[in-house]
């Protein structure tokens, strides 16, 4: 099993508007200086939040990528040049911009709000020729699978309405009770996991809130929770079938 840990200190840092919006970036831009570079069909992953003041990232352009925002806490408002109106999003909601041949957007963070923004690689040779499109998904749109030890919100995968052109993605949020949890995989997949809350253990290594890990080249792995924990998981191809520039 290939298992790597990226602590908060290993992640790139960023901010907007003189620190009104703060960021840790498990996968940053090349100039950001974090330890982890793009891989699989993941190009960029930012964990962004505000404290006691709302703040806006002004209108800026995108092309090619599929850019997803996952609202973890609070509220954001989104504007783009496709819909030409502000759209509110709350905790648990997800937005996707299929940037295609070009779109510009702006984001307003309410105070005490928190998101992931993740850029995924579709096949750029195809996506750059498509018109841009945009969808919002409410938390209530997503299927939740429960058992005695965990609850899993399926954001992208079996039974999810979320449409993406990026190949081979599964996106889950797992709420895990204390104890042992077995995750199945294949050697063709890589699991990218962010610890949203709590504390977990893998191969006798203690992993705290805010830490990012990836796991690959295994048919299964075990996560032990020392207490109730929440993790955000993206499963993607170890080697996509198309060029990604990663």
For each feature predicted by the language model, list its residue ranges:
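Short conserved micro-motifs at the rims of enzyme active sites and ligand-binding pockets
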Residues: 183-185, 243-246
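A short glycine-rich, His/Asp/Glu-containing loop-to-beta-strand
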Residues: 15-59, 66-67, 115, 141-182
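Short acidic-glycine-tyrosine-enriched beta hairpin
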Residues: 80-98, 201-225
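Extended, compositionally biased flexible segments
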Residues: 12-14, 30-110
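Ligand-binding loop in jelly-roll beta-barrel domains
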Residues: 99-126, 206-208, 216-245
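Hydrophobic secondary-structure block in the mid-to-C-terminal portion of proteins
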Residues: 160-214
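Short, conserved beta-strand element in jelly-roll/cupin
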Residues: 61-77, 119-123, 173-176, 186-201
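Surface-exposed beta-loop interaction hotspot
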Residues: 96, 106-163
């Amino acid at each position: 099993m290939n298992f790597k840990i990226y602590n908060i200190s290993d992640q790139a840092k960023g901010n907007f508007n003189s620190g009104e919006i703060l960021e840790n970036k498990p996968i940053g831009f090349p100039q950001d200086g974090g330890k982890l570079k793009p891989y699989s069909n993941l190009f960029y992953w930012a964990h962004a939040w505000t404290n006691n003041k709302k703040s806006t990232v002004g209108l800026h352009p995108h092309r090619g990528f599929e850019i997803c925002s996952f609202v973890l806490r609070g509220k954001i408002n989104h504007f783009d040049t496709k819909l030409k109106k502000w759209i509110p999003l709350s905790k648990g909601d997800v937005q996707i911009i299929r940037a295609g041949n070009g779109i510009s957007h702006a984001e307003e963070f309410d105070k005490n709000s928190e998101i992931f923004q993740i850029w995924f690689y579709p096949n750029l040779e195809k996506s750059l020729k498509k018109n841009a499109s945009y969808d919002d998904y409410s938390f209530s749109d997503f299927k939740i699978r429960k058992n005695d030890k965990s609850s899993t919100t399926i954001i992208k995968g079996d039974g999810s309405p979320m449409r993406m052109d990026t190949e081979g993605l599964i996106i889950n949020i797992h709420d895990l009770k204390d104890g042992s949890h077995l995750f199945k995989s294949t050697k063709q997949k890589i699991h990218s996991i962010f610890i949203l809350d709590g504390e977990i253990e893998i191969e006798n290594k203690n992993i705290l809130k805010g830490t990012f890990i990836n796991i690959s080249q295994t048919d299964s792995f075990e996560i032990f929770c020392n207490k109730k924990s929440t993790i955000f998981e993206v499963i993607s191809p170890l080697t996509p079938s198309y060029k990604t520039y990663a």
